[in-house]
Amino acid sequence: MFRLPHRMSRGSVAALAVAAVALSVTTNVVAARAEPAEPAGPQQRLDRLVTKTGLPGVIAAVGDADGRVRTYTSGTGDLATGEAVPADSRVRIASNTKMYTATVVLQLVEEGKVDLDATVERYLPGVVRGPGGDGRRITVRQLLQQTSGLPDYDSLVVEAGGSLGAVAHTYYEPHDLLDAALAEERHFAPGTKWEYSNTNYVVLGLLVQRVTDRPVGEEITRRIIRPLDLRDTYWPRVGEQRIRGSHPHGYLADAPGAPWEDITRMDPSLGWAAGQLVSTPADLGSFMTALVGGELLAPAQLAEMQETVRAPHFDAEPGWRYGLGLARAELDCGVVGWGHGGDIQGFETRNLVTEDGGWAVVAVTALPTSMDMVADVSDAVEDLVCAADR
């Protein structure tokens, strides 16, 4: 549903599982947008990822600055039948949803309907009040930047027994998520620290709905998905547990080495505006390219989005910085990569786009059970995007 950063930093597999309360593609390749994969370095890199980690399968899309897109798969798409991973797979992209939610908020800023430095209270009077935080002291910018101090709502999973499988078929209203977070103690004073919390983006989803008087999923669809013709990206309907169209099965394990449990059918409402979207690696790459390329935001708002702060423990690899729903890393090959990533029951996605237009998206078909596995996926994405940028 969302992204694993802060949970992973706790250093235990149990925390990893509870953490995957948060989320961070597959590649549905439409002929007009992609070319068939050719046997080369990327295929070997993904084969090695599956062999080393024991993850069931992987789907990746790689794009270069000239607009060429190639897709690759490795491993097994259905452990029960042994079928391969479909090349046109859709997956749950989890916390990558935050990039879409942030883009809508920044479009509202451009339209003069939202002020980044106004308090949450202006738009949601009386909504954010409790031990976990006070909307009168938190700004919209701090929500986007993950510096609000609002705690996450991991308690919902803990109360269900600590297993993500236990909440896989539970429907949550957005206010259920917010209420669980506000019942916890505030982690720090707003603006004094960075810490990843899905609650920030739940509040932003509520803000979008209050300002536009429309559902946040509808605004994401109207403002981003349709204009970019992302035909394999969609916001699941209320209560919708299946993944539409071609997709691999997604898996979850209780601990390293434990059997993989099929968790493909699940209710993504635990992620909502922080992690509910379904997409393909190719569509996700197209979105990131359009975002960083200035197609979705005016220069002033894109500059705000790319103004970053240190983001310790954002991912298994150090050195990340976080902007307004978009993260930045300096890669070993000497280029700057922008992206996010996400983790949810059944899937993990990592992605990067460079300012030169090269990009890579990798989705694995199980939630990793160790920090080493997360690092392996992140390393694979970096290798692919660096090769694409040459």
Task: Label each region the model flagged.
Residues M1-E35:
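Secretory targeting and sorting signals
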Residues F2-H6, A31-T73, T212, P259-R390:
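Catalytic loop of the DD-peptidase/beta-lactamase superfamily, centered on the K-T-G motif
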Residues E38, P42, I93, T97, ...:
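Hydrophobic (often cysteine-bearing) scaffold residues that line and stabilize catalytic clefts
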Residues L46, A60, D66-G67, K98-T101, ...:
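Residue-level preference for non-acidic, small/hydrophobic
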Residues T53-P56, A80-R141, F188-S197, W272:
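Short active-site loop at a secondary-structure junction
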Residues T71, A80-E83, D152-D154, V335:
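Short, solvent-exposed loop/turn elements at domain surfaces
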Residues G77-L79, S148-G149:
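Solvent-exposed coil/turn segments that connect beta secondary-structure elements
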Residues P131-V336:
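Short, surface-exposed loop or secondary-structure junction motifs
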